[in-house]
C-alpha cells in the first residue's frame, strides 16, 4: 500500500543537514495530511489534521504561505500526540511512504515523534520522493543542470495545469498522489529506473 503525506510547518530548518535528533533545528508541525491507497490505486483512508501549537506560535511568514495562523490552529487543531498516533497507525499498513520533497517531511514528522516520545516505523519503510525522482522527467533548467521541480511544476508538466490550494497539506498530498499515479500509469518511472 502507498501512504502519501505532506506537512505544513512553522518555517524552514536552520540547517538542512542536521540530524532529526537536533530538535531545536527542525520547525514545528502545523498541518499533517495523508492518503493511504491500496495496490489497485484506490484510496482507503485519509486524514487532514491541523495541530494545536504547544509552547510555540506560528510565525506570520509561515501562515502567509499556508494560511494557518496560531489562532486558527488553537480553534481547529487536534493534539499532536493524537495526530502522530493516527499517522503511525496508517504507517502500519504502508509498503511505501511517498511525498514531494520527502526528506523534509520525514524530518519534520521524525522530530515530532521524538518530541512526543512516540515510537514509529518511519525509518524502516521504503520512501519515494516525487521531487527527486522527476528531475530528469520535468527537465527544468537550473543553475547546475536540471533543478528539482516543485509540486506545481510537476503537476503542470504531467497535466498541463497547476492545482488549487498549493501549500495546504491536503491539496498538496492529493496533487502528489495524482502525479505519482500518472507517472506510474504512463511508464515514466520505469524509464527512470525506479521501482515502478
Tell what function each PLM region has.
Residues 63-86:
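Metal-dependent phosphoesterase signature
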Residues 7-20:
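Short acidic, Gly/Ser-rich segments with clustered Asp/Glu that frequently serve as metal-coordination loops
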Residues 1-3:
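Extreme N-terminal starter segment of soluble prokaryotic enzymes
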Residues 15, 26-68, 88-196:
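Metal-dependent phosphoesterase core characteristic of DEDDh/y 3'-5' exonuclease domains
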Amino acid at each position: 500500500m502507498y501512504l502519501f503525506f505532506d506537512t505544513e510547518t512553522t518555517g524552514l530548518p536552520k540547517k538542512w543537514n542536521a540530524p532529526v535528533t537536533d530538535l531545536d533545528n527542525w520547525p514545528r508541525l502545523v498541518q499533517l495530511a495523508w492518503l493511504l491507497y491500496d495496490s489497485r490505486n484506490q484510496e482507503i483512508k485519509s486524514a487532514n489534521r491541523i495541530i494545536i501549537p504547544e509552547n510555540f506560535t506560528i510565525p506570520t511568514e509561515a501562515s502567509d504561505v499556508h494560511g494557518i495562523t496560531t489562532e486558527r490552529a488553537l480553534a481547529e487543531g487536534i493534539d499532536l500526540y493524537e495526530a502522530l498516533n493516527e499517522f503511525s497507525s496508517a504507517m502500519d499498513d504502508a509498503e511505501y511512504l511517498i511525498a514531494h520533497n520527502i526528506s523534509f517531511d520525514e524530518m519534520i514528522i521524525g522530530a515530532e515523534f521524538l518530541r512526543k516520545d512516540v515510537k514509529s516505523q518511519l525509518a524502516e519503510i521504503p520512501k519515494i520522493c516525487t521531487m527527486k525522482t522527476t528531475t530528469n522527467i520535468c527537465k527544468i533548467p537550473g543553475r547546475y543542470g536540471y533543478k528539482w521541480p516543485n509540486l506545481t511544476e510537476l503537476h503542470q508538466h504531467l497535466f498541463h495545469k497547476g492545482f488549487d490550494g498549493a501549500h495546504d497539506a491536503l491539496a498538496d498530498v492529493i496533487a502528489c498522489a495524482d502525479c505519482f499515479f500518472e507517472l506510474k500509469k504512463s511508464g515514466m518511472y520505469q524509464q527512470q529506473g525506479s521501482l515502478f
